[in-house]
Curated annotation (Swiss-Prot):
Superkingdom classification of source: Bacteria
GO terms under biological process: ribosomal small subunit assembly; translation
Key word RNA-binding present: yes
Lineage of the species this protein comes from: Bacteria, Pseudomonadati, Pseudomonadota, Alphaproteobacteria, Hyphomicrobiales
Listed PROSITE patterns: RIBOSOMAL_S19
Name of the protein: Small ribosomal subunit protein uS19
Gene3D superfamilies in the record: 30s Ribosomal Protein S19, Chain A
């Protein structure tokens, strides 16, 4: 179920402050965040965030298509190593 429109999008407060500080500075550095639950807002377009996936910070460059999505959607937490091969078919 989607979030109520009257509540507005959820964004951690510290994230807005970090984004404003990054916009003010001319350096383009990765902003490390742990808030996978925060919604991507239009103010974040053009910035690069390091979204923590439980192991490392995955760099995510925010584009206009990402607005309204959550940061966690772009930083997978699980690694798929493939299914095991069928040993009976290989035996010959």
């Amino acid at each position: 179920m989607a979030r109520s429109i009257w509540k507005g999008p959820f964004v951690d407060g510290y994230l807005l402050k970090k984004a404003e500080a990054a916009r003010a500075s001319t350096r383009s550095e990765v902003i490390k965040i742990w808030s996978r639950r925060s919604t991507i807002l239009p103010q974040f377009v053009g910035l690069t965030f390091g979204v923590y996936n439980g192991h490392k910070h995955v760099p995510v460059s925010v584009t206009e298509d990402m607005i309204g999505h959550k940061f966690g959607e772009f930083s997978p937490t699980r690694t798929f190593h493939g299914h095991a091969a069928d040993k009976k078919a290989r035996r010959g």
